[in-house]
């Protein structure tokens, strides 16, 4: 309904993931080392609002009501991508609803410069998803945002979080490989294929 992955249902490994019985080596993260350049959208930070479809607004308001009733915190995030002006205005509309209910709304499309995102290099599929280098930049930005606005307990070194430390060690090794691959693809002008 919101972000479909229905084609993945053909993979037996995904059925184990759905029931949370299969541990993922990177805690759900998938490395993308492709490069699919896209011009930087000129609508990041644009003003104005456009209403979202009524059924989506109803779902958003239901979620906000649930969070309020349960006394839960929530952070609504839009990751950077090759958005249109219409989409930016819809995010502005959603942001007003979310913040009016007392929750934070972080639209990373308003922070390209602070993130350091380079649309010609940091996307895997022509503006929809970041590659590993772009994801690292977004993660660094999000980390700083979270540390500025929330309080966390450092759980590194605790036995219960050992699997996270192991995943992070694996991630660091894979990330180095991805950086080299991405830089090589950019240098050679080898870009991702568009699959219809």
Which sequence ranges carry the predicted segments?
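Active-site segments of SGNH/GDSL-like serine hydrolases
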Residues: 61-87
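N-terminal start-of-chain detector that recognizes signal peptides
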Residues: 46-48, 76-78, 98, 153
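C-terminal regions of proteins
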Residues: 86-170, 178-192
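Acidic-and-aromatic substrate-binding clefts and catalytic sites of carbohydrate-active enzymes
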Residues: 51-56, 82-89
């Amino acid at each position: 309904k919101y972000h479909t992955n229905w084609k993945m249902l053909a993979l037996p490994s995904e059925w184990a993931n759905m029931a949370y019985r299969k541990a993922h080596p990177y805690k759900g993260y998938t490395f993308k080392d492709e490069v699919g350049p896209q011009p930087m959208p000129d609508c990041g930070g644009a003003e104005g609002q456009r209403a979202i479809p009524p059924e989506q607004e109803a779902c958003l308001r239901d979620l906000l009501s649930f969070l309020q009733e349960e006394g839960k915190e929530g952070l609504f995030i839009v990751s950077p991508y090759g958005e249109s002006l219409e989409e930016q205005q819809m995010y502005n509309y959603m942001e007003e609803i979310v913040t009016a209910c007392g929750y934070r709304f972080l639209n990373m499309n308003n922070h390209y410069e602070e993130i350091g995102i380079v649309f010609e290099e940091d996307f895997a599929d022509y503006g929809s998803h970041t590659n590993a280098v772009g994801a690292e930049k977004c993660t660094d930005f999000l980390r700083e945002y979270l540390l500025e606005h929330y309080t966390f307990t450092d759980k590194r070194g605790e036995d219960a979080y050992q699997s996270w430390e192991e995943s992070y060690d694996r991630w660091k090794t894979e990330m180095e490989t991805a950086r080299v691959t991405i830089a090589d693809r950019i240098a050679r002008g080898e870009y991702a294929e568009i699959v219809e």
